[in-house]
């Protein structure tokens, strides 16, 4: 009976709301007509919007963690062990709520950077804004037509933002910590397979070195000439402070 109550809450916080935020971000950031916008203006706008990069990274980390837990972790013996522990569903629901709140906070920061929050949403944090005004405002949002609504899901997204801004909790960063931990763990496990060279490849390379001993001097001479040519070419044509992207942007601006 307890799981029947927590399971819808877990689906809402772990799937429905993150999917809603993901589609909202894609919808709001796809309003730029890239066929008409120049490359210089597009790159400049992206470079001046670090909050956009932050929300994309947060969504990528969340869905990567979701895939890892539901399609890799749940098929291991650890899942069978957790089924015998009490309050496992409660802990999973609490964890999904914490991670989803972090996504909502990043989405609110993204909306504030884009200046797309309405006047109602900006008044949520005022001291005289009580719970009665909150629910009455939610009622007005749901049943009143808003011509300035820019959200894909409309009033559902406005209600989600308004409730989150009204009942704020201390900001946490569990999503970034868990994602970095799993990334380091996976890289640590994969590093021996990448750095280790098979014995067959070692023997093959050793035999190849013996056969190419006669041509070693000629190859070394040609490689030295090639290296000197690359150094001279790099020093004359491409200095150390050369930025290829800035060159492209300058040429694109001149064409515009």
Curated annotation (Swiss-Prot):
It is found in: Endoplasmic reticulum membrane; Preautophagosomal structure membrane. A motif (ATG8-binding) lies at residues 242-245. Residues 1-16 form the signal peptide. Induction: Induced in absence of NAP1. Expression is increased by rapamycin, which mimics nitrogen starvation by inactivating the TORC1 complex. The chain crosses the membrane at residues 68-88. GO terms for cellular component: cortical endoplasmic reticulum; endoplasmic reticulum membrane; membrane; phagophore assembly site membrane. GO terms for molecular function: protein-macromolecule adaptor activity. It is a single-pass membrane protein. Residues 89-256 are cytoplasmic. Changing residue 242 to A: Impairs interaction with ATG8 and decreases subsequent reticulophagy. One of its GO terms (biological process) is reticulophagy. Residues 197-243 are annotated as: Disordered. Keywords: Autophagy, Endoplasmic reticulum, Membrane, Signal, Transmembrane, Transmembrane helix. Residues 199-213 have a biased composition (Basic and acidic residues). Residues 17-67 are lumenal. Present with 1890 molecules/cell in log phase SD medium. Interacts with ATG8 and ATG11. Acts as a receptor for reticulophagy. Directs autophagic sequestration of folded tubules/sheets derived from the cortical endoplasmic reticulum (cER) and the cytoplasmic endoplasmic reticulum (cytoER) into autophagosomes. Is not required for the cytoplasm-to-vacuole targeting pathway, mitophagy, pexophagy, and non-selective autophagy. This is Autophagy-related protein 40. It comes from Saccharomyces cerevisiae (strain ATCC 204508 / S288c).
